[in-house]
Amino acid sequence: MNILVIGRGGREHAIAKKLQREDKVKTVYCAPGNPGMSGDNIRTVPISEEQQTELIQFAKDNQIDWTFVGPETPLIEGIVDAFQAAGLLIFGPTKAAAIIEGSKSFAKDFMQKYQIPTAEYRVFRRLAPALEYIEQQGVPIVIKADGLAAGKGVVVAETKTAAKRALVAMMEDQQFGASGQTVVIEEFLQGEEFSLMAFVSNEKVYPMVIAQDHKRIFDGDAGPNTGGMGAYTPVPQIPEEAVQQAISQVLKPTAKGMVAEKRPFQGILYAGLIQTATGPKVIEFNARFGDPETQVVLARLESPLSEIISSLLVKEQPTIAWNELASVGVVVAAEGYPNQYKTNLPLPEMSGETIYYAGVTRSEQALVSAGGRIFLAEATASTLEEARKKVYQTLDNYSFPGMYYRKDIGVKGLI
């Protein structure tokens, strides 16, 4: 079969690479992809994610059997609806269903309605009452831009000054444009975070193995939030009982609730969870694979991804098997990220390693950096300790000036 993957990051590289290795897959195209993907026989297509008409035409012209959407923005802009209207098979939620990620206020109200465990919250559309609420509630407190903000729209404020500064930046200074005109303010939850993703087809939920990602830029979870600096799986400090609880109290009622709301969800549902004293609670929902969690979770998927998605697209039950291995992925970023950083850093040739490229471009035949997060190095082994050793050994061998990465990815799992 011929498959089109939409997106350009490390997540899409991992999805495309997984598909490319499977027996029933003939060609994997990635639009627009990135130059780092071509070494894996993935054909990149110079059409960007928002060019719906051109993508539909490409799918028709190239006998694409089905399309997979990686990033959130095209989903929220209705790419699935457009493909379906053109009579094409595509795996991902419609615009109506992708709102679970596109609007945090929708997601919070939805969770309240369907009794899905989450933090206490209030939604504000005006600055003055939001500032007043901070005065009443005290800190620490969490402030979230309602719409998409590339993973950077959440502030955990330790002081009232920081909380107010975040509100002014979002609501008055338009830091995230329209995304920050409405904000959600919620209680700060204490506990261990984990990511639980699932293949979803209307009310049917097929959970994946859990992972833990590292959002902060510095070791020890210090510094500002990023798009993610690394991930690992399994997460031994999260008991199996908590995972089962999250499946029954979060994923299943969410899938059912979306059907009840006439927003049936088909695609990848991602629950960002925190294990509290009273069980798992939802921090956020995403309507797609997480990045960097995908790069480690797919390393543990034994069944062909192409067959799972092909089954779901025709409403058949897929066969899904996971291995017992451990996987650790470490993001290499440009020094200074997520603030000011240099681009055009020359990258070393990396052969035989599992590297998923993100912010890269080609300059005179060589790969150079073109973004904050440049690539993710992944290693799989029988234990987390071994996988950590392997991945950091790779990074030691391939160091280059201007690179930065966290040294503690997966340490929390070494219990």
Role assignments for model-derived ranges:
Residues 1-95:
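ATP-binding N-terminal substructure of ATP-dependent carboxylate-amine bond-forming enzymes
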Residues 310-415:
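Peripheral (often C-terminal) accessory segments that flank ATP-dependent C-N-forming ligase machineries
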Residues 4-5, 102-182, 212, 236, ...:
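Active-site nucleotide/adenylate-binding loops and adjacent lid/helix of ATP-dependent enzymes
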